[in-house]
């Protein structure tokens, strides 16, 4: 696998690295109903429930909204051995329909093009002239999680992932509010700013205590040039038996522009 292929996988590798060792189950649909269990500390107060409800609703209201989204992203990947890979990702998304991704190297030569829909994952390896087509279950095979188009779009747009509406507790610290939720796969400690209500970080701990793995995502350098609070710099840090770090630096981005999603298969490409 060439370096650009590795860079593409790096965009979802944190999910792979902290995947639970269990069979995939269908994720229940997200609803607006909030199931709240407040961990009692002394005498529970009604204010605790109110604070959790208010901040959960603010997180949901603060999600990036779009019909189409496109961005130019500098991707930096560093593995446990200190090996670094740098690439530029050109990303286009049509909500709930398609993810289109093109990865280029330092010389501006395109190496990988991806086309992901609800049903399929298609990859063009332009360096080795190989075409790969798989069902969308390929995402689940790679990550061993119920990852689908919608959750991958949320990840790329900067929305919370694996954040369950059943919140077990909250905490206040240094101007931040942290909400703790327990889902089918992860315990998610999600932190937002008390003042700006922007998503600051998400700490995902695997429920499988036999093989503890942690993913830490940060959302930095917010700006509101397009009418939405958008994190232009993000980091993904994975700690398992080995460690890896990913940095995503959004150089350009736009919402709701007319986009094309070109993906044609040259006749001389081998099918994988």
Can you name each region flagged by the protein language model?
Residues 98-149:
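An acidic-aromatic
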Residues 70-113, 119-120:
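Post-signal peptide N-terminal segment of secreted/secretory-pathway proteins
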């Amino acid at each position: 696998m060439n370096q650009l292929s590795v860079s593409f996988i790096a965009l979802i590798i944190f999910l792979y690295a902290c995947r639970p060792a269990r069979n995939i189950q269908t994720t229940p649909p997200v609803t607006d109903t909030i199931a709240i269990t407040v961990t009692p500390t002394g005498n529970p107060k009604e204010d605790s429930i109110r604070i959790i409800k208010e901040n959960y609703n603010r997180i949901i209201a603060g999600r990036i909204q779009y019909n189409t989204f496109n961005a130019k992203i500098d991707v930096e990947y560093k593995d446990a051995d200190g090996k670094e890979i740098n690439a530029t990702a050109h990303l286009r998304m049509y909500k709930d329909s398609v993810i289109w991704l093109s990865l280029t190297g330092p010389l501006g030569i395109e190496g990988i093009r991806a086309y992901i829909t609800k049903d399929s994952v298609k990859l063009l390896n332009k360096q080795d002239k190989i075409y790969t087509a798989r069902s969308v279950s390929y995402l689940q095979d790679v990550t061993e999680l119920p990852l689908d188009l919608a959750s991958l779009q949320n990840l790329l747009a900067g929305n919370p992932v694996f954040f369950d509406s059943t919140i077990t507790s909250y905490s206040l610290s240094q101007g931040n509010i942290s909400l703790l939720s327990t889902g089918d796969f992860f315990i998610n400690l999600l932190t937002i700013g008390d003042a700006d209500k922007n998503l600051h970080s998400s700490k995902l701990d695997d429920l499988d205590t036999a093989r503890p793995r942690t993913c830490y995502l940060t959302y930095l350098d917010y700006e509101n040039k397009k009418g939405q609070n958008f994190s232009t710099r993000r980091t993904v840090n994975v700690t398992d038996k080995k460690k890896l770090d990913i940095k995503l630096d959004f150089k350009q981005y736009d919402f709701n522009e007319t986009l094309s999603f070109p993906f044609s298969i040259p006749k001389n490409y081998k099918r994988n």
